[in-house]
């Protein structure tokens, strides 16, 4: 069968979509061949697939929509922009039976479709939400990042957020092999990070993915510091620089020694001017960035207590700076979109200031302290937020309380707004089956419209695939829009990943999820918890029982992708046994024994990291478990 792919546009993204279409169709049916692509129409070719854009009146750079009309391997895939054409190609392949289960081609289920020429597909679909993305966290290799970017549009995502001016912090966490004493640190530099960043930029542009950038780090720039991550600095600030930092307990300087956690004296005219200048200069140099995130420092209870600052809410000072940035960008005739953050102290809405040009801005709701035991529910009446007390706040866990803060901001800002959420940042380590956290994601996304939020950005590790990639799979599908129930999406995923025995895997992982507590592992509540202890004992028993299912599986008879998923499930089984033992002892109040069990678990995952590097972020598991769950840091074995 000879097919010609015809391009109705010279867009690089549409050309890339064509190359992807050719690659996967040739995998689906090895009888398919492709004639040389050309822009010229030649009716002698009976089978032709055209890729192009809708008429100008139906095009939009922001709203993703595609149309698939293909019968007998002839027809078209069109979109509202080049990215939408690429999304349409991947949806066509999905309708043919392809399943993109994890980043990396080895984790794709590609069916054999012998009579593909008999298939007729007709679909037109518009994305349910405008903002559909993932933000980098954890320790990452360049390959981890690039494979994740390649995976995003296959599931319907349209955005990627590369935090900081350079992704040095996340790459260096990998190359330094922090939290894995079994691996030797490797040299890494800002120069190398810049090289990798350029490659990442090109891959985003190839797919026309919306490029989000920076976030935290502007406060470092104002102080003349590089953003190297959440690490201490021994730099001595000049007197002028020190006077720019927040006054806390009568002292100025780096907050707890960490530049990125250091807020500034935001009433200081020099700080305001420098902040606006830094953002404007970056925007001028980086027109490829679609959404420039302008945040303050990380951490909480670290705002300036000088006589001028303490007269104002942090959010009032923040909005004043945002207006100055808007004014500077306007003077330079830059239309850069600025994303501002509702987070920690900034949850309290301003009472004095307002954004003068709301169309410039996108509001991002970031409920970092929320519970993941439940999904969002909207009560008939929201309570009033607790009064703000400078540097004495307690972050809200309750979802209703979090939503009360959002509601106050939505009274004064009526522009674009999306949810920046954290199910795959820390909480997922507390759900060993990944079914609970996947359902939370499913339910949260289906409630975004009711919350007046136009999308979702997941702040997460790029290596969160143990036991599988179901959470991100469901996230992408739901954000673009699906009529499938949660159960239908799970079945679709598990059938492709595990084959004929998928129901055994589903029952097993569901049981694990039912026994787990995301919030406990995320540091919420007392460390001594009889219910958690009881459940962790059952987790170990459940995992040990599943050994017989793994042993009975004739893995050699499975397709390669399913062999990989079963291999990961076998590793994951031992992971669960060792981790649940440590959690049982911790929750039972046997701290010393818990530390020993934690050391055994840590050695296991560190020793296996090379084999399962793409599935589990060892650095992040250890970081979360020592900073939040309550285990000791193991520096050597």
Predicted features along the sequence, with ranges:
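Short, solvent-exposed alpha-helical surface patches in well-structured domains
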Residues: 16, 87, 273-274, 504
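Catalytic domains of carbohydrate-active enzymes that cleave complex glycans
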Residues: 38-39, 46, 452, 477-637
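Long, hydrophobic, amphipathic alpha-helical segments used as structural scaffolds
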Residues: 29-32, 100, 215, 333, ...
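Aromatic-lined carbohydrate-binding surfaces of glycoside hydrolases
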Residues: 10, 57, 128-406, 410-413, ...
């Amino acid at each position: 069968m000879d097919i010609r792919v015809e391009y109705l546009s010279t867009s690089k993204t549409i050309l890339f979509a064509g190359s992807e279409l050719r690659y996967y169709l040739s995998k689906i049916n090895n009888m398919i061949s492709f004639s040389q692509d050309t822009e010229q129409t030649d009716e002698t070719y009976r089978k032709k697939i055209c890729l192009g854009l809708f008429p100008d009146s139906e095009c939009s750079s922001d709203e993703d929509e595609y149309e698939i009309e293909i019968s007998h391997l002839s027809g078209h895939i069109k979109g509202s922009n080049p990215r939408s054409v690429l999304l349409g190609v991947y949806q066509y392949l999905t309708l043919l039976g392809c399943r993109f289960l994890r980043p990396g081609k080895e984790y794709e289920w590609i069916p054999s479709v012998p009579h593909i020429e008999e298939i007729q597909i007709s679909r037109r679909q518009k994305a349910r939400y405008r903002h559909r993305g993932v933000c980098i966290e954890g320790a990452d290799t360049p390959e981890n990042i690039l494979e994740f970017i390649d995976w995003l549009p296959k599931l319907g995502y349209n955005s990627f957020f590369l935090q900081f001016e350079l992704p040095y912090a996340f790459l260096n966490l990998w190359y330094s092999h922090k939290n894995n004493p079994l691996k030797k640190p490797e040299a890494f530099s800002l120069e190398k990070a810049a090289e990798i960043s350029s490659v990442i930029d090109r891959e985003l542009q190839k797919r026309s993915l919306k490029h989000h950038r920076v976030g935290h780090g502007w406060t470092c720039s104002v102080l003349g510091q590089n953003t190297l991550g959440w690490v201490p600095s021994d730099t001595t600030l000049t007197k002028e620089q020190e006077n720019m930092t927040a006054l806390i307990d009568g002292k100025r300087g780096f907050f707890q020694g960490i530049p990125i956690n250091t807020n500034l004296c935001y009433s200081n005219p020099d700080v305001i001017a420098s902040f606006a200048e830094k953002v404007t200069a970056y925007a001028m140099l980086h027109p490829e960035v679609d959404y420039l995130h302008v945040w303050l420092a990380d951490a909480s209870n670290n705002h300036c207590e000088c006589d001028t600052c303490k007269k104002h809410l942090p959010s009032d000072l923040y909005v004043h700076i945002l207006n100055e940035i808007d004014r500077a960008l306007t003077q330079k005739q830059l239309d850069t979109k600025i994303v501002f953050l509702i987070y920690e102290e900034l949850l309290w809405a301003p009472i004095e200031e307002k954004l003068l040009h709301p169309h410039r801005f996108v509001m991002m709701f970031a409920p970092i302290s929320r519970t993941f035991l439940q999904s969002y529910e909207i009560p008939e009446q929201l309570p009033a937020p607790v009064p703000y007390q400078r540097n004495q706040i307690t972050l809200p866990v309750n979802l209703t309380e979090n939503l009360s803060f959002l509601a106050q901001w939505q009274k004064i800002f009526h522009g674009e707004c999306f949810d920046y959420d954290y199910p795959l940042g820390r909480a997922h380590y507390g759900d060993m089956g990944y079914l609970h956290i996947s359902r939370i994601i499913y339910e949260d996304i289906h409630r975004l419209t009711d919350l007046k939020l136009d999308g979702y950005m997941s702040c997460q590790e790029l290596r969160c695939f143990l036991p599988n990639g179901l959470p991100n799979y469901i996230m992408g599908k739901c954000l673009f829009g699906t009529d499938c129930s949660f159960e239908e999406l799970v079945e679709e995923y598990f059938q492709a990943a595990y084959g004929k025995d998928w129901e055994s895997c589903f029952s097993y992982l569901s049981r694990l999820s039912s026994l787990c507590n995301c919030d406990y592992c995320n540091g919420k509540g007392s460390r001594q918890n009889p219910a958690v202890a009881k459940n962790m004992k059952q987790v170990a028993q459940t995992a040990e029982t599943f050994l017989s299912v793994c042993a009975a599986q004739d893995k050699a008879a499975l397709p390669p992708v399913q062999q990989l998923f079963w291999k990961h499930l076998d590793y994951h089984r031992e992971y669960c046994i060792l981790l649940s033992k440590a959690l049982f002892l911790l929750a039972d109040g046997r701290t010393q024994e818990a530390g020993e069990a934690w050391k055994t678990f840590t050695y296991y995952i560190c020793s296996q990291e090379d084999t399962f590097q793409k599935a589990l972020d060892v650095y992040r598991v250890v970081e979360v478990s020592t900073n939040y769950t309550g285990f000791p840091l193991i520096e050597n074995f």
